[in-house]
A protein has these predicted regions:
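Beta-rich carbohydrate-recognition modules and glycan-binding surfaces
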Residues: 64-255
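Glycan-association/targeting regions that enable binding to alpha-glucans and other polysaccharides
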Residues: 1-107
Length: 255
């Protein structure tokens, strides 16, 4: 049914949900015209206008579907999944740019991959930041996030954490809340209780140019952390002008 504007809502019977993924097509009827979406990689021209008819009319099958993940209401909220050297995570350095090497570490047949970040300093007292946008993931699980109490970060359990390694969030109103990371468990999992997050300066990233512009926002008012306002996940660490800084990062989630 239509809920407003171009937004429509449907209730899917539980019996139609198989495994952890729901696949579906959308059939649009207007007058005597019926079009099916998506078209996938079919050879049709003007594929944005859909495929004529509905699947019951065709003498062939189409493997093109939209998909939606299906999870249990009390399951963890994944914030970062390492899949390749990009993995939707951005890297920055303040006060200036530094060299960065990103390498996917995926040599084990039984463990999930890690993403190695290796920063080479070019100036004095650098600070390194890793950020990824997670607002959409939070909004998809609004009810669940209210009950989450721990931020979990998987790292290489055989390597020491970088100096000043901290983790937390930037909210939609521009405030940053972080906590120093404790030592990981024997499984390589860092667990940070959300109640330990503290308001701190917000790094103004990407790096401003010219470089004499402000690089941090210093809050003057103490504002409580609200998980439902999370916009970005942020990790940060300190460096110096002589030593490489390296972190091998795995999946990150809320539970």
């Amino acid at each position: 049914k239509r809920t407003g504007g171009y937004t429509y809502q449907a209730t899917i019977p539980a019996t139609e949900i198989k495994d952890d993924c729901f696949r579906y097509n959308i059939i649009v009827c207007r007058g005597n015209s019926t079009r099916t979406y998506p078209t996938g990689n079919s050879g049709y021209r003007n594929s944005s206008s859909g495929i004529k008819g509905n699947p019951l009319d065709w003498n062939y099958t189409s493997g093109a579907y939209w998909t939606t993940r299906v999870v249990a209401p009390d399951s963890a909220i994944p914030l970062l999944t390492i899949t390749d050297a990009d993995s939707r995570i951005e890297a920055y350095t303040l006060p200036e740019w530094n060299d960065l090497q990103r390498t996917l570490v995926d040599s084990s047949p039984v463990e999930k991959p890690l993403l190695r970040f290796r920063f080479t300093p070019k100036g004095e007292n650098p600070h390194y930041f890793l950020r990824t946008f997670v607002k959409n993931l939070i909004e998809e699980r609004k009810e669940r996030v209210k009950d989450c109490s721990v931020l979990c970060i998987r790292v290489n359990r055989t390597k020491a954490l970088p100096e000043g390694f901290s983790a937390g969030f930037v909210t939609s109103d521009g405030y940053t809340y972080k906590s120093p990371c404790p030592a990981p468990s024997s499984e390589g999992i860092i667990r940070i209780p959300l109640k330990d997050l503290r308001q701190t300066d917000t790094a103004l990233l990407p790096v401003a140019y010219p470089t004499f512009l402000k690089q941090y926002f210093h809050p003057e008012t103490e504002i409580a952390f609200l998980p439902e306002r999370i916009e970005k996940l942020e990790l940060s660490m300190s460096g110096n002008k002589k030593e490489l800084v390296e972190i091998e990062l795995g999946n990150i989630w809320l539970e």
